[in-house]
Swiss-Prot record:
Gene Ontology cellular component terms for the protein in this record: cytosol
Protein's gene: smpB
Subcellular location: Cytoplasm
Primary localization class, coarse: cytoplasm
Record's protein name: SsrA-binding protein
Organism (species): Francisella tularensis subsp. holarctica (strain LVS)
Amino acid sequence: MSKHKVSPATIAKNKKALHDYTILEKFEAGIVLQGWEVKSIRAGKVQMVDSHVHIKHGEAWLFNCLITPLLSASTHVVADAAATRKLLLNRREINKIMGRIEQKGFTCIPLSMYWKGPRVKVEIALAQGKKVHDKRQAQKDKDWAREKDRLFKKAYK
C-alpha cells in the first residue's frame, strides 16, 4: 500500500447551496447505503440539488438526495431513488446542529458527497438563507472580481 493519501474524490456537489445560503459551519457525516446505491454512486448517478437534512428522534436524516438506480443493479430489490438516508454523526455534532436548526432562519444542507477511502462521506453545513438583495450583491462582487482580474491581466501583458 502507498503511504501517500489520495485526495477524496468528489462524487456530487450541491452548487445551488452556495448561491442560496450563507455557510456558517461544516461537518463530515457518514451515510448508510444499500448495495445498489453504492453501485449507482460509483457510476455518478447522484443529484443533491434540493436535498436537506432533518434531525428526528436524535438522528440525522438526508432527504431528497436522488440516487438513480442502475438498470443492471439488483433487479429483485425495489429501488427508491428519493429515499431518506440516515447520516452518521457524533452525538455532540447532532446536538449542535439541532440547537442551531431550532433558531429561526437556520437550516442544515448537504454540500457535497465524496469518497474517503472505501466509504462515502457527505459534507453537510449549517446555513442561513440569503435574501434576494444578498444574492444580487454576491453576484456583483463576483463580477467585479472577474473584471478586475481581466484589467490586471491586460495591464501587465
